[in-house]
Swiss-Prot record:
Positions of region (Required for interaction with TESK1): 333-444
UniProt entry keywords in alphabetical sequence: Acetylation, Cell membrane, Disease variant, Lipoprotein, Membrane, Methylation, Nucleus, Palmitate, Phosphoprotein, Ubl conjugation
Region Disordered, annotated ranges: 123-151
Disease field: Legius syndrome: An autosomal dominant syndrome characterized mainly by cafe-au-lait macules without neurofibromas or other tumor manifestations of neurofibromatosis type 1, axillary freckling, and macrocephaly. Additional clinical manifestations include Noonan-like facial dysmorphism, lipomas, learning disabilities, and features of attention deficit-hyperactivity disorder.
Membrane topology term: Peripheral membrane protein
Protein's GO biological process: negative regulation of angiogenesis; negative regulation of cell migration involved in sprouting angiogenesis; negative regulation of epithelial to mesenchymal transition; negative regulation of ERK1 and ERK2 cascade; negative regulation of intracellular signal transduction; negative regulation of lens fiber cell differentiation; negative regulation of MAPK cascade; negative regulation of transforming growth factor beta receptor signaling pathway
Function recorded in the entry: Tyrosine kinase substrate that inhibits growth-factor-mediated activation of MAP kinase. Negatively regulates hematopoiesis of bone marrow. Inhibits fibroblast growth factor (FGF)-induced retinal lens fiber differentiation, probably by inhibiting FGF-mediated phosphorylation of ERK1/2. Attenuates actin stress fiber formation via inhibition of TESK1-mediated phosphorylation of cofilin. Inhibits TGFB-induced epithelial-to-mesenchymal transition in lens epithelial cells.
Annotated protein name in UniProt: Sprouty-related, EVH1 domain-containing protein 1
InterPro entries assigned to the protein according to its UniProt record, in alphabetical order: KBD, PH-like_dom_sf, SPRE_EVH1, Sprouty, WH1/EVH1_dom
WH1 domain segment(s): 6-123
Amino acid sequence: MSEETATSDNDNSYARVRAVVMTRDDSSGGWLPLGGSGLSSVTVFKVPHQEENGCADFFIRGERLRDKMVVLECMLKKDLIYNKVTPTFHHWKIDDKKFGLTFQSPADARAFDRGIRRAIEDISQGCPESKNEAEGADDLQANEEDSSSSLVKDHLFQQETVVTSEPYRSSNIRPSPFEDLNARRVYMQSQANQITFGQPGLDIQSRSMEYVQRQISKECGSLKSQNRVPLKSIRHVSFQDEDEIVRINPRDILIRRYADYRHPDMWKNDLERDDADSSIQFSKPDSKKSDYLYSCGDETKLSSPKDSVVFKTQPSSLKIKKSKRRKEDGERSRCVYCQERFNHEENVRGKCQDAPDPIKRCIYQVSCMLCAESMLYHCMSDSEGDFSDPCSCDTSDDKFCLRWLALVALSFIVPCMCCYVPLRMCHRCGEACGCCGGKHKAAG
C-alpha cells in the first residue's frame, strides 16, 4: 500500500482500539494470534481518491505496539460478514480471508463495531455505481446550465444597436450570481458609450445611463427568479464570550452518533437548548477582540451602503479557555466503560451494563455456567465457533429444544447449575432497585 494509506489521518479514521489480531486455523478449528502474540493498535480508516469524485477506499490496519510491525491490513467491502461472538471477541470474513480481534474491554469492541458499521454505510452510499452514470449526470447538468445561460443572454443582449466585443466564455462552469452580476454591470457601463440614437438633440450620456440601469434591473429580476438567494438587509453574527465557548472533542462526536439511536431522549433537551441559544445574539464590547467586516452588495440596490451584509467573526488563532459545564440538568460526564454520558445525580447501581459487577461474577462462578458454555461450544457451535446464550429464551433458534434438554441433562451432573436462574432473577430485581449492578465511572 502507499504511504498515504499507511499513515492515515485522524479525520478519516472511524475507530482506533487496542486488541490482539487473530486468524482462523482451519486445520485445528480454532483462532490463533496473527503474526505472533502481542497487543496491536487496530484502526478503521478511509483513503480518499485523488480524482475528488467522492469515492474512497476503506481499510482495517493493525500495527503491533512492541515492534511497530503491520500484522493486519485488509480492505473493507460491501459483502463483509461480521460476527460478534463474545463481548470481547469479534471476527469477520472478507472473500476467503477470516480475521478476528480480542479486545481489552467490551467498550473497545463496541467502538470498533460502530466504526465498521459507519464504514460499511459510507461504502454503500459513497460512490456512484459506474463511471458512465456519473459522466451522464455531469453532461445533463451541463446541458441544463447551457440552456439557462443562453436564455439569459438572449434576453439581455437582444438590442441590435449594442456592439459587443466580449470574448467567448464557456458555460460549463457557472459563475456565482454576484460575480456574474458585477461582470455584466461593468460590461454595461463599458458598452454605454457605443449605443447610438437616431434622434439628434438628446443627451446621449443620460440615455446611456438610463439604458444601463434598466438592463441591470432586468438582470437582477432574472437572477432572483433563477437562483432565489434571499439576503437580509443587515445581519450581525457575533460569538459568545471566551468563557462560554465549549470545547468540542472529536471522539465525543464519533461516539455520540451511534449513542443517539439507543438513547434518543438523552440528547433531546440538549438539541432544543442549542437551537434556542443559536437565535440569541450575544454582544459584549471588548477592545481586545478583533472583528472583520465583509460587505456584499444587495441585489436591487448595488450602490447603497445600508443594504450591505456585515459578518462579524473572530480570528481562529485565539486560544479558547476551559469550558464551563452547564448546570441546568446537573453535571454530565462520560463513562470509561460504556462511553455513554451520564448524570452524577442519577448514577446508581445497575445503570452501566459494562461496568464490573462482582455479584454477577460470583453468581456466574457459583452456578458453574462455564461448564454449560463449554458444552455448547463443543456440541452446538457452528463452523465459526458461535453458539447461543445458555439461558436464552429465543424460540426462533433451531436448536432451542435441544439446548435446553442438554442443559437439563447437564444439571444432573452439575447440580449447582440449577441455582443460576433464581440467583439471576434476584440479581435483576436488585438492579431494578438500584442495589446491584455496575455504576458509571467518569473518565479522567
